Structure formats: structure tokens, C-alpha cells
Design a protein with these regions (language model features):
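Predominantly extracellular/luminal regions of secreted and cell-surface proteins
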Residues: 30-68
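Short proline/glycine- and polar residue-rich coil/turn motifs
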Residues: 140-146
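Residues that form or immediately flank small-molecule/cofactor binding pockets and catalytic motifs
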Residues: 50, 127, 139
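Compositionally biased non-globular segments, especially hydrophobic aliphatic-rich helices
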Residues: 6-11, 17, 52, 59-60, ...
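Catalytic domains of carbohydrate-active enzymes that cleave complex glycans
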Residues: 1-35
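Aromatic, loop-rich ligand-recognition surfaces of beta-strand-rich domains
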Residues: 69-135, 146-185
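Intrinsically disordered, low-complexity repeat segments enriched in small/polar residues
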Residues: 10, 65-67, 160
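Prokaryotic Sec-type signal peptides and long signal-anchor helices
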Residues: 5, 21-24, 135, 143, ...
Length: 185
């Protein structure tokens, strides 16, 4: 199909039509094309801070449904957070689980006031109340990067039932935080 489409575009351009340049088309975000399997797949997510109803994606199942987002936050796979605490969720793994990594992807679209997080905290707990911090990292958010995607991960070995992921916006820029999946391996 693609080869035929390129030929059709060339023919149309030769006749003076201004078509979309298919050679510059990058297609879907590769991560969005392949469903994920991971330890948190289908697990309950407890929202310690709510997602925004305008960008609910698939609701409470979004962050553990195995579906990664495409290039735009309105595609139904990215969940948006604008409350004071931004992203603050706990994944109930149902049983004590050996965990080797926890990852979430974030997007930045400066023109829409969507920014990468200024800080991320990843924690684990046996009881859902007392958490042990695995990672706390602060970031400098560069608003000169108009569009950017970034994974923020912890890697190691730990056991726990509850995995908490927190991402905060910076005081300077504020704005939205969008993520598509909490990946636990």
C-alpha cells in the first residue's frame, strides 16, 4: 500500500496538486502498537489524587491495561492529571510480589501546557500504608523542548504488594502531567 501511495503522491504532485508529503510521515508511536504484558497488568489502581475527567482515557483501568499511548494526549490511552498533587497512584499487586522494575512514560507538549514531571517518587509497601521509597528524582523541565517523551524508571529487586508512583509538576511551569501505563516487571 505504502509504495502505491507514494507513487500516487508523486503523480499528483506532477499535476500541480499539493499533497501531504508521505515520505516525512512517521506513523504511530512504536510503543503504542504492541500490547504490553507485565506484572501489574489488570491490577487495581488506587488514585490518591484524581485524574481529570476531561482526560480520563479508559478510566480506572487505564494505567494497567497494557496499552501505551500514541503521539497525542487525546488518543484515549494517556491519562491527564492537573490536581495539586498531579499523579499519585498506588497499584495493588494483590499479593507480595518480587519486583525488578517500575516504569512510567510521560509526554511534554509545551503549547498545551503539558510538561514532564519535575519530580518522581517510586515506593513499595506490604500494607498499603507504610511505604519504602525506592527512588526520588528531581528533574529540570526544559520548556524549550516543545514535544518530548520520557520514561522514568526504578530498577533493582524488592518485594512488596503495593507500588506507589508519584509525579509532581514544577512550581515554575505547573501544567498537566500525562502518563499512559505503570509498568511493573
Amino acid at each position: 500500500f505504502y509504495a502505491r501511495a507514494l507513487k500516487a503522491v508523486t503523480d499528483l504532485q506532477a499535476k500541480g496538486y499539493h499533497t501531504f508529503d508521505l515520505k516525512s510521515e512517521i506513523g504511530s508511536r512504536p510503543e503504542s502498537l504492541q500490547p504490553l504484558t507485565h506484572l501489574a497488568l489488570g491490577k487495581k489502581v488506587i488514585y490518591n489524587a484524581p485524574y481529570n475527567s476531561s482526560y480520563a482515557a479508559q478510566g480506572d483501568v487505564t494505567l494497567t491495561d497494557g496499552i501505551r499511548g500514541d503521539w497525542t494526549y487525546g488518543d484515549g490511552a494517556w491519562q491527564g492529571f492537573i490536581s495539586k498533587n498531579r499523579l499519585d497512584v498506588t497499584v495493588d499487586m494483590e499479593n507480595e510480589t518480587t519486583i525488578h522494575s517500575v516504569t512510567a512514560a510521560f509526554m511534554q507538549v509545551v503549547g498545551a501546557e503539558v510538561f514532564l514531571p519535575a519530580s518522581v517518587v517510586i515506593s513499595v509497601s506490604d500494607d498499603g500504608v507504610n511505604f519504602t521509597e525506592l527512588k526520588h528524582q528531581d528533574f529540570v523541565v526544559n520548556k524549550e523542548e516543545a514535544i518530548k517523551f520520557s520514561d522514568v524508571s526504578w530498577e533493582g529487586t524488592v518485594k512488596g504488594r503495593y507500588v506507589r508512583y508519584q509525579a509532581r509538576a514544577g512550581k515554575e511551569l505547573g501544567g498537566w502531567i500525562f502518563t499512559d501505563e505503570i509498568i511493573v516487571k
